[in-house]
Amino acid sequence: MQDYKIEFIKFALSRNVLRFGEFKLKSGRVSPYFFNAGLFNTGADLARLGEFYAAAIQANRLAYDVIFGPAYKGIPIGTTVSVALFNRFGLDKPVCFNRKEAKDHGEGGNLIGSPLQGNVLLVDDVITAGTAIREAMDIIAANGATLSAVVIALNRKERGKGELSAVQEVERDYQCRVLSIIELDDLLAFLETDSEYSRYLPSMKAYREQFGVA
């Protein structure tokens, strides 16, 4: 496992973004872990978060023209990712985000920032039902752009109502790569080597066995 993945897990734990225990999800499932990226909510947190996204983007050698952060959670993520890519790698990439309701005055429209054109790198926190990605795809298509890849913080690798995960459904429906800073297997690998949290490994393995995807 790459160093940036280990560091991200430790960072998420230190901010209570990632917690182990017993959590009731919206789906009704009881999960042995919970991830809430909204708790990355200070300048220092967001700066580091952007660096982890940038590391994942560079590690996967993604080709793209513009970064798109869909409203609402994707807006600060897209912003901090663009700054991190410049500060760490010297890449000055344009960034764009949408507003939920179009304005009919001022700059108008529902997009802010760079024009949404060419190959688009979409950044968000997680994909649960895939609804936000589908809404973003409508916006990308309406502007004549192409979705190049999606990068999220965590891939739960968990089945939805069918046999596929939400991430797999997005990859199938839009023929694009969905990458993540970390995924469920990374959490398991971390638990296997960390004495402080290793007690959660059995419940995590059991959850993956019941709900996980390949």
UniProtKB/Swiss-Prot annotation:
Orotate binds at residues 34-35, 128, 156. Pathway: Pyrimidine metabolism; UMP biosynthesis via de novo pathway; UMP from orotate: step 1/2. The keyword Magnesium applies. Its cofactor is Mg(2+). Catalyzes the transfer of a ribosyl phosphate group from 5-phosphoribose 1-diphosphate to orotate, leading to the formation of orotidine monophosphate (OMP). Homodimer. This is Orotate phosphoribosyltransferase. The gene is pyrE.
